[in-house]
Amino acid sequence: ESGVYTGFIYCADPNGWGNEFKFQKVAGDWGTEINSGHMTGGITGDFADGGGNFKATAGEGVYYVTLDMANMTLDAVKVEKMGIIGDFNGWGGDVDMTWNATDYCFEATNAGVTAGGWKFRVNADWAINLGGETLDDLVANGANIGVAGSTVKLYPTRKTSDKIYCTVE
């Protein structure tokens, strides 16, 4: 209720509503909504006040959101680039991933990740990165991933699971 919540959301505008949205404290219960009017501490980054709704000012895409209920602030960073970096490429430069809007995942083929360790990072920067000891529970600033493979899919939005996870084939 008064904590800091972080996560990825996918904003699309299939109905022409201008990429506007609200959060719900309880799924399906609009009486528990959190909207832009509640953010007395401000809205920063790639979101703005959309007249009661949050508005994704950078348009359709995936965003990393930090919602601070204690200070009533919201910050959002648009994921312009999701990348994979690690031992397999000497930790130098990202393997770019593409967004698959049908499956709600970022994917890369021929990534060539190795068991030597690797991570996901947003916008070629370490400020937002994901790792983990298991593929089915990735976290911010988590441990290096130690699974080898070619095709990597990252599911960040929690649409298909309560956790952020990836698959490696």
Question: What do the PLM-derived regions correspond to, one by one?
Answer:
Residues 1-169:
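Insoluble glucan recognition modules
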